[in-house]
């Protein structure tokens, strides 16, 4: 049996631009793509923390070191400059791979510079 698990996550990145008439996709700073192990043209899920929108598109390379997160094409209607996003990818794993898998997590500051690469997601405590 295969299961679909979180492969990588850019946590709380900030939208730097929205280009409605660009040919589509989401441009992401190459440093962030590499840190999260997201490849060009890979499907990504985007969750907008500000407005609750959730949508899928694909990643393209943004200028390295720029902190760019550009939501493009029709998806630009689902985000605004300054919005906080979670960008995630998923992959299928068999049972043995699942036991060994750890997602690539990338935490950033307000300029989308990498501040932490945590080893996992901690157990959530009850209130």
From Swiss-Prot:
<dbReference type="InterPro" id="IPR003190">
    <property type="entry name" value="Asp_decarbox"/>
</dbReference>
<dbReference type="GO" id="GO:0004068">
    <property type="term" value="F:aspartate 1-decarboxylase activity"/>
</dbReference>
<dbReference type="GO" id="GO:0015940">
    <property type="term" value="P:pantothenate biosynthetic process"/>
</dbReference>
<protein>
    <recommendedName>
        <fullName>Aspartate 1-decarboxylase</fullName>
        <ecNumber>4.1.1.11</ecNumber>
    </recommendedName>
</protein>
<feature type="binding site">
    <location>
        <begin position="73"/>
        <end position="75"/>
    </location>
    <ligand>
        <name>substrate</name>
    </ligand>
</feature>
<comment type="pathway">
    <text>Cofactor biosynthesis; (R)-pantothenate biosynthesis; beta-alanine from L-aspartate: step 1/1.</text>
</comment>
<keyword id="KW-0456">Lyase</keyword>
<dbReference type="Pfam" id="PF02261">
    <property type="entry name" value="Asp_decarbox"/>
</dbReference>
<keyword id="KW-0963">Cytoplasm</keyword>
<feature type="binding site">
    <location>
        <position position="57"/>
    </location>
    <ligand>
        <name>substrate</name>
    </ligand>
</feature>
<dbReference type="GO" id="GO:0005829">
    <property type="term" value="C:cytosol"/>
</dbReference>
<keyword id="KW-0670">Pyruvate</keyword>
<comment type="subunit">
    <text>Heterooctamer of four alpha and four beta subunits.</text>
</comment>
<keyword id="KW-0068">Autocatalytic cleavage</keyword>
<keyword id="KW-0210">Decarboxylase</keyword>
<keyword id="KW-0865">Zymogen</keyword>
<feature type="active site" description="Proton donor">
    <location>
        <position position="58"/>
    </location>
</feature>
<comment type="similarity">
    <text>Belongs to the PanD family.</text>
</comment>
<keyword id="KW-0704">Schiff base</keyword>
<feature type="active site" description="Schiff-base intermediate with substrate; via pyruvic acid">
    <location>
        <position position="25"/>
    </location>
</feature>
<keyword id="KW-0566">Pantothenate biosynthesis</keyword>
<dbReference type="InterPro" id="IPR009010">
    <property type="entry name" value="Asp_de-COase-like_dom_sf"/>
</dbReference>
<dbReference type="GO" id="GO:0006523">
    <property type="term" value="P:alanine biosynthetic process"/>
</dbReference>
<feature type="modified residue" description="Pyruvic acid (Ser)">
    <location>
        <position position="25"/>
    </location>
</feature>
<comment type="function">
    <text>Catalyzes the pyruvoyl-dependent decarboxylation of aspartate to produce beta-alanine.</text>
</comment>
């Amino acid at each position: 049996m295969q299961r679909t698990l979180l492969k990588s996550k850019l946590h709380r990145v900030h939208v730097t631009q929205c280009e409605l008439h660009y040919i589509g996709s989401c441009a992401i700073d190459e440093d962030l793509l590499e840190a999260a192990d997201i490849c060009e043209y890979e499907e990504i899920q985007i969750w907008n923390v500000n407005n609750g929108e959730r949508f899928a598109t694909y990643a393209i390379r943004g200028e390295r070191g720029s902190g760019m997160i550009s939501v493009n094409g029709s998806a630009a209607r689902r985000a605004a400059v300054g919005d906080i996003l979670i960008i995630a990818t998923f992959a299928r794993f068999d049972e043995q791979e699942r036991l060994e898998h750890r997602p690539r997590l990338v935490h950033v500051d307000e300029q989308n510079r990498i501040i932490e690469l945590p080893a996992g997601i901690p157990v959530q405590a009850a209130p």
